[in-house]
Amino acid sequence: MKHLLALLLAFTLWFNFAPSASADDFANLTPCSENPAYLAKSKNFLNTTNDPNSGKIRAERYASALCGPEGYPHLIVDGRFTHAGDFLIPSILFLYIAGWIGWVGRSYLIEIRESKNPEMQEVVINVPLAIKKMLGGFLWPLAAVGEYTSGKLVMKDSEIPTSPR
C-alpha cells in the first residue's frame, strides 16, 4: 500500500494539474505614465508628509514603474537588471542589514560569555561594548568568511550539548 501511495504521489507531482506559470514578458503591463487608470488615481494621491507636494512627487516616482490594467504599479522580481531597483537592490540591502544585526548580536554574546555575570549583561546591555561591536560589524561578510575558513564559525558535533531525552 505504501508503494502504491508513493507511486500515486509521484505521478500526481510529475503530471501536476496546475498549468505551468508563464510570464508573457509583461505584455499586460504598461508604463504608469501612459496608463489611464493610474493617471486617474494619481490625481487623488494624498500628501503623507509635511511636504505639501508629497503626493505629487510620489505620483511622479510611480509614473516610471509598470502598471497593470487596474492602475497599480507592479514589482518586477524576475532577476533582470533593468528592474534591479524594484526588488533586487532593496532585498540585498535588507539581507546585508539583517546579517549585520545578527553578526553584531552574535559577537556581543560571545564577548560577554566570558564575563562574570553574562546573563545580566544580556538583560542590561553593556552600551559601550555594544557600540564597539556595532561599529565593527559593517564588514560582517568578510569576518564571516574569515571565521568559516578558519573553522571558528561552525562548532564540532562533539561540542554541541544534547538533551538526554
From Swiss-Prot:
Alphabetized UniProt keyword annotations: Photosynthesis, Photosystem I, Signal
GO biological process, one term: photosynthesis
Keyword Signal: yes
Signal peptide per UniProt: 1-23
Cellular component annotations (GO), alphabetically ordered: photosystem I; photosystem I reaction center; plasma membrane
Record keyword Signal present: yes
SUPFAM superfamilies, per the entry: Subunit III of photosystem I reaction centre, PsaF (SSF81536)
Alphabetized Pfam families for the sequence: PSI_PsaF
Family: Belongs to the PsaF family.
Role this protein plays: Probably participates in efficiency of electron transfer from plastocyanin to P700 (or cytochrome c553 in algae and cyanobacteria). This plastocyanin-docking protein contributes to the specific association of plastocyanin to PSI.
Protein name, UniProt field: Photosystem I reaction center subunit III
Species whose genome carries this gene: Synechocystis sp. (strain ATCC 27184 / PCC 6803 / Kazusa)
